[in-house]
Amino acid sequence: LSKGGIEASRVLAEALDAPVCVGYQHNDAFPGNHPLYAGPLGYNGSKAGMELISKADVVLCLGTRLNPFSTLPGYGIDYWPTEAKIIQVDLNPDRIGLTKKVTVGIVGDAAKVATAISSKLADGAGDTGRADRKNLVAQTKSSWAQELTSMTEEQDDPGTDWNVRARAAKPDWMAPRMAWRAIQAALPVEAIISSDIGNNCAIGNAYPSFNEARKYLAPGLFGPCGYGLPSIVGAKIGRPDVPVVGFAGDGAFGISVNELTAIGRGDWPAITQIVFRNYQWGAEKRNSTLWFDDNFVGTELDEGVSYAGIANACGLKGVVARTQDELTAALAQAIKDQMENGITTLIEAMINQELGDPFRRDAMKNPVEVAGINKDDMKQQVV
């Protein structure tokens, strides 16, 4: 949101006691400690936010283009309130009504529009059902917080069993959500984080919350693979007084691993980078398991490569974490080293090969036969 947009949104939300959801990977667009904050919508977002918005009769969409990643179903819930009145506010007129049908479109600055609406509210606006609404928000958030804490396993689609096999293959390894819980236990509330594209970073969408703006760097719909490391370096250059942590899967990290050769130079500030190590391109593999009968092509990564080893070779500190306790301890020490000793740490978090939901289930479908192609021509791949 533009300058002043978060504060203007807070004032309006409090006047109505209306729950506030944010878009995919925009977890810093509203204070996470606010009682009306319901979390991010979209892929692996907040079930609380999804359940609350599904009950809405009016939705005010401030400064958002309502992109598919922020509105697609999650956890089996098709939550977008198709019968509600939708008011969309955006500076770009081309985005109004682009992805969702809107009742009212407003071309304008989110902060100015929110302030104007607040100033025009009638006395008693929002009073009807106010107490019940506040209780519903609190209860829904509490229920989701308990459920999220207990979530460990990723679910398979009917007719597939990749995640069952992944757990059986590495029963002692962390699941992705176990790693995210371990990270949350040591991540400073004031930290700036960056997220690369990919399955394991996206699984973590529901976990981080922020009490200040400009704390979450994410690639958004551009989808640039390798974004996580260089963006967190830039964040540290801009805010050397703030702890920073970058996140990337091992596939995406391989795109920017060469930056490790530069980070160790004396005039570069120290950072912390976590790499989720499961030796696969996860998002692509999930599509393969669901729509191509486990016919993986180019999704496997070399298990002989050690990113922690590469970091050490570049004069940095490389650490391997195999358990939740090890990961929490490694991150806590890395933050201390970053802020007090000027040491850059790369943490390889060793996780099993479980896969989250496909990114765009709504945009994919089963393949169809193509004329002239015989399935007998297909060769079995050894994995």
Give residue spans per PLM region:
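Short internal beta-strands
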Residues: 19-24, 87-90, 273-276
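Glycine-rich, acidic loop regions that bind phosphate or pyrophosphate groups
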Residues: 26-145, 331-335, 348
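Glycine-rich phosphate/diphosphate-binding loop of Rossmann-like nucleotide-binding domains
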Residues: 1-14
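General beta-strand structural signal in soluble alpha/beta enzymes
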Residues: 21-23, 61-62, 88, 108, ...
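A short, gly/pro- and small-residue-rich
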Residues: 11-17, 71-91, 213-214, 360-374
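Active-site diphosphate/adenylate-binding microenvironment
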Residues: 9, 143-241
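Thiamine diphosphate
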Residues: 6, 36, 43, 50-55, ...
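Short glycine-rich anion-binding loops that position phosphate/pyrophosphate groups of nucleotides
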Residues: 1, 25-27, 64-67, 198-200, ...
